[in-house]
Amino acid sequence: MSYLTKIIGTKIEEVSGMQPIDVPVTKPISLLHVMSEGFHIISEIKRSSPSKGMIRETVDVAKRARQYEKAGATMISVLTDTTYFNGSFDDLRQVADVVTIPVLCKDFIIDERQLDYAKHYGASVALLIVAALHPTRLHELTRYARSIGLDVLVEVHDEAELRIALELDDVLIGINNRDLKTFEVSLETSIDLMKRYPEVTFVSESGVSTVEAAARLQEAGASAILVGEALMREEDPIRLLEELKTCSLKSVD
């Protein structure tokens, strides 16, 4: 059984127990517009993962979110999965309460109820993973997310999934360098797809821990990178974030 299959099985059980929740409906932001110019960093709150185990068990989520924003992050991603990533919707709320930049609810979303919870707890963006959803369901959840004021980041891992994502209108596409079936990581996943689709605005996700990696991805066409584990392992995430931002400054020079 792959990691993804196991996680989705758990999500099906979780969703069945989710109670109705108040959803404040607002106008969604245009994440695609935000990311279309320049080079951006999406910084992540990620306590653990199935492949790496515990990354940082004790963390002041609000403090770290403020550090991310201060250092120039364009958006903050928050893992809300509890079983496999030790995250929570409480983490999401703590981040949303203290920053002014967009906040991404990063989870394995398969149902509208999860989107309701994401919006209720302060997210402005939700992650939808092509590999986890039938194309019809992907379209349905995208429409529903926007109807309650959430923009979406649509995640792909290969060209077949990218073609499905491109059928959606005006969405930002993230390329996960981590294979969700095996959890193995390769930056070549992003580099290959970005070179073949230079007209698409892409976020490169996973496996970015150095300035050299960030620069390589930007040169290949990334408009943004999502950095989680590397920042969470840092006692001083501001330093690493500022170093990663130098890629953007050098491109301007």
Swiss-Prot record:
EC annotation? 4.1.1.48
| Keyword vocabulary terms for this entry | Amino-acid biosynthesis, Aromatic amino acid biosynthesis, Decarboxylase, Lyase, Tryptophan biosynthesis
Quote the pathway field. Amino-acid biosynthesis; L-tryptophan biosynthesis; L-tryptophan from chorismate: step 4/5
**Among its keywords, does the record have Amino-acid biosynthesis?**
yes
Q: Which reaction does it catalyse?
A: 1-(2-carboxyphenylamino)-1-deoxy-D-ribulose 5-phosphate + H(+) = (1S,2R)-1-C-(indol-3-yl)glycerol 3-phosphate + CO2 + H2O
The record's PANTHER family line, in alphabetical order, gives: INDOLE-3-GLYCEROL-PHOSPHATE SYNTHASE, TRYPTOPHAN BIOSYNTHESIS PROTEIN
The molecule here is called: Indole-3-glycerol phosphate synthase
Could you read off the lineage of the organism from its UniProt record? Bacteria, Bacillati, Bacillota, Bacilli, Bacillales
The encoding gene:
trpC
